[in-house]
Amino acid sequence: MSHPNLLVELFVEELPPKALKKLGESFAGTLAASLKAGGLAGADAVVTPFASPRRLAVHVTGVAAKAADKSVLHKLMPVAVALDAAGNATPALLKKLAALGADASVVPSLKRQPDGKAEALFLDSQVAGATLAEGLQKALDDALAKLPIPKVMGYQLADGWTSVNFVRPAHGLVALHGDDVVPVATLGLVAGRSTHGHRFEAAVPTVELRHADSYAEQLETEGAVIAGFEARRAEIVRQLDAAAAAQGLKPIDDDALLDEVTALVERPNVLVCQFEPEFLAVPQECLILTMKANQKYFPLLDAAGKLTHKFLIVSNIRPDDASAVIGGNERVVRPRLADAKFFFDQDRKKTLESRVPGLARVVYHGKLGTQGERAERVRAIGHAIVNQLRMATIPYTVDAQDEFAVLDSKVQQAALLAKTDLLTDMVGEFPELQGIMGGYYARHEGLRDGVAIAIEDHYKPRFAGDALPRNHTGTVLALADKLETLVGLFGIGQLPTGDRDPFALRRHALGVIRILVEKNLPLDLPALLNGAVPAFGELIEDPRLALFDFMRDRLAVNLRDQGYSAQEVDAVLALEPARLGDVPKRLAAVRAFAALPEAAALAAANKRIGNILKKAEGTVEARIDAALLAEPAEQQLAAALAQVQPGADALFAQGEYAASLQALAALKAPVDAFFDDVMVNAEDPALRANRLGLLATLHGAMNRVAELARLAA
């Protein structure tokens, strides 16, 4: 039998826009989950959340008027306590039964069964299912209690005496089961079928809902409200795209801004506005941030991604003549843009170098000193990185004009100036622009080629998917800056814990990993840490072991997120490769090897060899004495290994990891024969030691790219 659908709406004053989406999802999800748990809604019930600035609502399909009765087995007490020697009920049992609404007449029907400790008595009773009014009241109370509200407000109800606490004052409650009102109450409100539409543009003062299923349609036609968050968001996107296309432009793509604007309007209406073109002399990042952060506007870009003097607003009203709305928004944004222009002009009156002494007055961390001291540490770490690139066994090619001495000089200059924009008016107003403004001011001063870009890029990557630094100077500076942060904070014990990572150390670690891997730099992570620690002198404890493990864990998570299996990642990282730029090639090689028909047997054999070597007494040397190869199978394995290993090693040295691993496939047959025909732990100590040496040599040859035993099932 099908059941009617349910609609519940709480009508409130304007909700916090940044929290609205989560509030709507939480309200709908918790209420529906409670109904399902109470047997009033099926597991397959469709739950539709609604959330607008002035309402939280949910529509649930197939809700029963009453939950089914159910049988409940109540454990009473051990038989020895419940019955006396004659088998009669004890006072303790009668008291327990009375508490459950039963009497002595049910004693003969009580069930006996063990409870894990002793035999006990159980009462099998029928519990009536909750009515919808009962179940919905509980669900509504749960949903409101579990809303993710950071701060509540207290307000008085209409009686003038009662006070309640909620995120915003509530003024209406709707609960419809089909076309019937469900008698529930909350926050001093009793459920009905009346709600309100748009504050200014509703066709009727109150919307009388006919049915649970007519909620969205009636609110839109009678109340001028698009109640669904996603439906309203989609309508805003449609209007933004259409308005931008009509201008031959495109709106900026910003999901967070779109969500916030969706939470601010109930009837979106997109309008085109503009500002004076002379403001475009200010860096577009400043203007865009001003319009987005302060005014919630959508700047318009041309086909090349350059900011234009036009922007879009999302109004909550649709007047016949929108000129007043457009003019008002253009008038409001003008002082904001003028402020940005003033900051930009004032900042350029001082050079970045003249601001360097001011860094000594900006505290970075109580235990790590000032930004001035930090800049000197970044310079020292940058110098160490350049030296490591110079000495790398794999040549690192810099630009023709960037000999290593020149590169080091640029890194030193960029590191000294990188944080000076923290002292500018623009960054003081918009901290999000740090680095970006430093780059603009450096270009304005005509600093050396590449230094301005390095200053601008040294925070990159700022987030997942962000671009990496664009030049060599920026790459070294970004590494040095992130390593300074990681080493310093780990060195004073400020490690991330659980969900808490106030210094974004996970992001910094991932930034180092991405730069090393994606730019395939010939740098070893342990060497980088070794080069960074001395910059701190006596300020910190040695963090290298903990930090290396931390970065290894972040690398493993990142690789799994890219689609590599846990086995593949474990196999490569088990060798703790120092050069992270090698890791993608090693993973590709492992994946190719695993697809070979010989892979499973070789991985299993590798695991077996590892276990044998672990159990061997003393140190096993990877050495083979041909004169002690007594059995044909061990002779054949030694010969096959002698033939395969040089080629595999040469391929490994050339970075041809896939080919190196694939060369090992030829060892499957002799390895299988060895384990079938040869007793490793021979009684003769010399034979035993030689066979262990053969296995150690084989183990070393097989595990240069990855620890193949990790691939064994």
UniProtKB/Swiss-Prot annotation:
EC id: 6.1.1.14
Pfam family of the protein (one): tRNA_synt_2f
Disulfide bonds: none
Catalytic activity: tRNA(Gly) + glycine + ATP = glycyl-tRNA(Gly) + AMP + diphosphate
GO molecular function, one term: glycine-tRNA ligase activity
GO (cellular component) term, any one: cytosol
InterPro entries for the chain: DALR_anticod-bd (IPR008909), Gly-tRNA-synth_bsu (IPR015944), Gly-tRNA-synth_heterodimer (IPR006194)
GO biological process, one term: glycyl-tRNA aminoacylation
Gene3D superfamilies: Isoleucyl-tRNA Synthetase, Domain 1 (1.10.730.10)
Family: Belongs to the class-II aminoacyl-tRNA synthetase family.
Name this protein carries in UniProt: Glycine--tRNA ligase beta subunit
Gene that this polypeptide is encoded by: glyS
